Amino acid sequence: GIRTIGELAVMDLELLKRHLKKQGEFIWNYANGRDVSPFLRELPRNKGYGNSMTTPFDVTDRETAWQVILSLTETVCARLRADGMEAACVGISITDREFRHGSVQTTLISATDTTLEIYEAARSLFDRLWNHSPIRQMGVHTSKVSPKGHYQYQLFDRGLHDKYSRLDAAVDEIRKRYGEDCVQRAVFVENRIPHMSGGIDKVKRTGVTKAV
C-alpha cells in the first residue's frame, strides 16, 4: 500500500528487506535521502589529456598553425606533468571555416610528458592532415596515459629526452612560484596567440594563478 516516497521513508526497514531483499534497503535509503555509495578517497585518473582552441581568426598558413599546436601542447603537457603522468598516444583535430572536422592520432615509441616531444608528434600529424582550408578550431589530445616510468630511449636520441625533461621541470618550477606567464617561448612574445591556451582555466591546468 505504499504510494509516495514519504510513505516509503517511514516504512519498517526489516519488513522491506524481507519482501524486496537488498533492493528494499536501497530504495528505503534513497527515500530517506541517504547515499550509501562507496566513498572514493581519490578521483579516478584521467584516461587522456587534451585541449582545444577556437581561434579568433582564420589560420591559413602552416607556421601559425604550428604556433597554435605548440600553445595547446604547452597546456596539455603541463597538466600531464602536474599529475605525474605521461602519454603514449598523441592526436590532433582540426575544424575548418566550413565546420568540416578531421582528426588523426599516432602511437609514440615511448610514453612521454615532455612538451617538445609531444609537440613534434602533433606537428607531424597536422602536416599529414591539413588540406589547406582555413582553420577555426584546433585541438591536441593525448591518450594511453600511465604513471611516469622509465623512458624507452631511441637509437639516435642523443640525450634529447633528458634535456627536454630537465627544461620542462625547470620551467614548471618557475611557473609554479611566479605564475605561468613569467616564462614563455620567444615565438609568443607580442603574438596574438597566447603561449598556453585551451578550454581549461589556469588553476586546473597548473595549480597556479599568479605570483604572490
Language-model segments: residues:
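Acidic, metal-coordinating catalytic segment for phosphate/diphosphate chemistry
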Residues: 110-212
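DNA-contacting surface of Y-family translesion DNA polymerases
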Residues: 2-135
